[in-house]
Amino acid sequence: IGGIPAANAKCASHAGMTPAPHSSHPQAWGPLLQPPTVKTEPMDDGNFSKEQTSGFYSEGFHSASPSSSSKDSNGHSPRSSGSTREPSPFYDAMPLKAKANLGMHLDSFRNSLPYSLLTPPGFESRASDARDHSPSYESYSPRTLAPPAHVSHPLGRSDATPPKSPPRTPSSPERRSFDRFHDSGFDGVDHNKHDGDDGREGSGLEDDFDEEPGLRVPAVNSHGKVKTFKCKQCEFVAVTKLSFWEHSKEHIKPEKMLCCRKCPFVTEYKHHLEYHMRNHMGSKPFQCSQCSYSCVNKSMLNSHLKSHSNVYQYRCADCNYATKYCDSLKLHLRKYQHNPAMVLNLDGTPNPLPIIDVYGTRRGPKQKPLSKIFEQQTGTNNHSP
């Protein structure tokens, strides 16, 4: 009887039959007979590995998406056959821990701001106070299970009001100069009234330009000639006010430039801007006593009063040219290279004091010092026989 198994084994070996796997290799079937282990979410804060706490951008993002480059999809997925790790379910707790870790980073970034993003300018109450005193989802959210992240220290008070936004357009030097002009007590401008009559704030400059066609169209004087505007600092000559004002900006420093709000008028003198603003408002306080003429300053009134006089104060010494205005005499002297004669008073008597500055920019004649007149008189008396 004892020889029968040996004979059977010998016959099986001669027949080419393979032995049973459980008899020859018992270690290959051992893991299959054991009950599968199920991975559960740990509740202790100290049981997290370094790989699980690496942050949202390392493993948490890949674990949330079943991509081919993810570690969880390669190592923990039951579909991978070459993995040497312990098998675990496909949907584990890594996405929750990654989101919790991301929330902690966002809280640290929010606490590092010097002001609250939810607090509007001028409103000092914190919008997050109600959140601190009210029941929050943080008490039961998965972020409480995540390991503590690095929290930076805040730079300042978290309830500080954020700084106000800068104006849409930076304040230009000419705008600051014009504001100083209005703050100086000029009583001719209504600050509460908009510049435009159509209710629009500011009322674009182009609309105001069209109200005065003389700005863009050349004007004709009483003699039928085109009126020109000559620059006093160079040889530039313009035929319109607009082109002349644009050229004047080249000779005025930005910190001294004064601009009109209703037109492109520019100047560096405060009283010139005041006279110009009176023209816009229709305010002409200087009235002529002999006609209905009115103007914005006394200099213009004095020039107008000469039109009612029969005395030609300014004359040429080389010809019979005579005029009532000093500027007209200067143009004549420059053109023909003549010399001026003695200036007359309004009553027609000679006046030795005024000096005609032919090539100067001064409006009107200069006044000769009395000491020079006395020296001239004494010199003529000494040379006389």
Curated annotation (Swiss-Prot):
GO terms for molecular function: DNA binding; zinc ion binding. Residues 63-77 have a biased composition (Low complexity). Residues 1-94, 124-216, 361-385 are annotated as: Disordered. The keyword Transmembrane does not apply. Residues 374-385 have a biased composition (Polar residues). GO terms for cellular component: nucleus. Keywords: Developmental protein, DNA-binding, Gap protein, Metal-binding, Nucleus, Repeat, Zinc, Zinc-finger. Residues 126-135, 173-203 have a biased composition (Basic and acidic residues). Gene3D superfamilies: Classic Zinc Finger. GO terms for biological process: segmentation. The keyword Hydrolase does not apply. It comes from the Eukaryota. InterPro entries: Znf_C2H2_sf, Znf_C2H2_type. A zinc finger (C2H2-type) spans 229-251, 258-280, 286-308, 314-338. Coiled coil: none annotated. It holds the Pfam family zf-C2H2. It is found in: Nucleus. Belongs to the hunchback C2H2-type zinc-finger protein family. Gap class segmentation protein that controls development of head structures. This is Protein hunchback. It comes from Bombyx mori (Silk moth). The gene is hb.
